[in-house]
Amino acid sequence: MPKLFFAFLLFTFCQLSAQSRKPLAGKEPSWITQTAIDYSNTSMDNDAEDGYADLDFEKQISLADQCVYIRKCVRIISEAGVQNESQVSVTFDPSFQQLTFHSIKIIRGGTAINQLQLSKIKTIQQENELDNFIYNGSLNAVLFLEDVRKGDIIEYSYSLKGFNPIFKGKYQDIYSLQYSSPLYQLYYKLIVPGGRTVNIKNTLDTIKPLVQTQPGATVYEWKRNNIKALHTQDYLPSWYEVFPDVMISEYNNWKEVNDWALSLFPKNINLPGALQQKIKEIQTTNTTTESRVQAALRFVQDDIRYMGIEMGVHSHKPADPGKVFNQRFGDCKEKSYLLCCMLRAMGIEADPALINTDFKKSLHNWLPGPTDFNHMTVRIKIGNEYYWFDPTIAYQRGNIRDISYPDYQCGFVITDTTTSLTDIPFHEKGEVNTKEVFDIPDMYGQAKLTVTTTYSGSYADETRYDFKNSSNYEMLKNYKNFYAAYFEQITADSLVTADNDGTGIFTTKEYYSIDSLWSLDKGIKKASFTSFIVQSIIHKPKDQQRNMPFSLQFPAKYHEEIEINLPEEWNAKSSEENIHCSSFMLHSKFSSSYRQVLLDYDFENFKDHVMPDEAKDFFANLNKSNESQGYKLTYNEKKTSKPSASHTSKFIYILLGVLLLVISIVKISQGK
């Protein structure tokens, strides 16, 4: 219901904005450079994707006019292209941008057919981040082209006038130089008025701009033709930069970025009475600095729901902390700023920290600028120690020393003296411990399975979040479906949980009944077991011959113990295997005692990626253990000898052949 309500408010706002910022039709700006397109070049069409070839992309910017001119041109080469590229779509922010179309045409047989009719252009509210509770007010101007045919060329151009005033006139952008599909012609132009300078830095390319001096301006141009597609490999780390580009920034250093940020997140502000009362309540109830931090953090995480209205300047400017407190919602910057203000009012040093959740430590190679970031968290100092917290993660529990913080690697802490990025130490002490007990009373009836799992750190946060947002029925069904992949005749009996606020440990206990645990093969009963948890969370990239790194879940620390209680004594061989390389470790141990067989696994990733020069050694270490992981129990009723247990290479192949890329079985906590 809240989402529908705010969607309605946003819709109303956008309708009003759309009426005052409807797309216009007009002439091209006088300052652009006219470039010719070679429509006849088809040399790379065979490498094109989605049924169309990109003939031209150009972007020209006038900083003095705060205007961006765009031209695109594609050739439809198949019926799939007719489906995929028969519309013109432009996104703009009506709060500060005016969209003007200059030309929309279909070129067929050398004849241009005009398609620019404002009456047919629909302005649509399109909230792509709605599922993440982010509302930015952007509109989408869409024209559905009629009578598009194979072989047609679609060409259109438009301008967006107006920069986001939150940046106070300063410019920052990234110009891409290569894409996953071929591009015949690429052109960038930047006009910088006199008295202003830009910093330029290339990534993965050595292209240099053509620089010209004009009266009152400096003009930079980048041109490139016949750009081949850059094909990437699967499971790349988010921070790995694949595509070459040119970074542009008017910010000369991080101090200038800090000065900009300080104006948005001032330290000394007046807090409303209701918020002051809440702060006083926390101080009175909690007598130590640590407990006050814990109480304030829990309030902001759990009682201030995550939702952002990020239209216009509010893409970066937070709402007043008092307003956030009263309305009980805010996005990452608003929740972080509120927490900082509350802690500062208690005399605790707390500062907001800008983060890039995707590129992380790669920011060290970027030009300084406020658009380098997509998230905000908090750094707190108690005594001589720093603590990092993410207020957008709900339901974190435990002592502040044990509360997990994502592996963001580096950030920009907004203080009076900040002049550089700050490296963030890795802080994750959590792990998952699972014990699966199979009670098999006889060789014919029903077996019982009891699964006890303790989660700590971020694993506890994620599991706690799932239980808070799903019914016990849904969780039990999901857990049962997990084991049903191994045991078809399994039924779920019950699921109970325990949550320790003091330690932050979350415990689940699952109870199952399994019919037909044993399969019959030529008079011999068989039952197979493997590391169910580790096997399920690990996946293998398709591209094993790597020239790019591949990602691993990090952190990832799991211990799994399988206890099999049997109706009679069993012959079983004990064994132990240790695998260790620069990226991960796996320890597996098998032992037996009278009527019991024990399987024990420890798995941990040491980092979030494997570099290409490490891949060969990585796979070699996996292959060493392909005969020691899985266990098969066999029982021959016709023989008098004891039943036996043995390793099964099939299961180790399944397990270790996929010991690479980990996908969490629980949803990570909310947050931008």
Spans of model-derived segments:
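Sec/Tat signal peptide C-region and signal peptidase I cleavage site
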Residues: 14-18
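A periodicity- and composition-biased signal for non-globular, repetitive helical segments
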Residues: 8-9, 298, 666
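A sensor for short, sequence-defined functional sites
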Residues: 19-662
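Sec-dependent N-terminal signal peptides
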Residues: 4-13
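C-terminal membrane-anchoring or membrane-association module
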Residues: 663-672
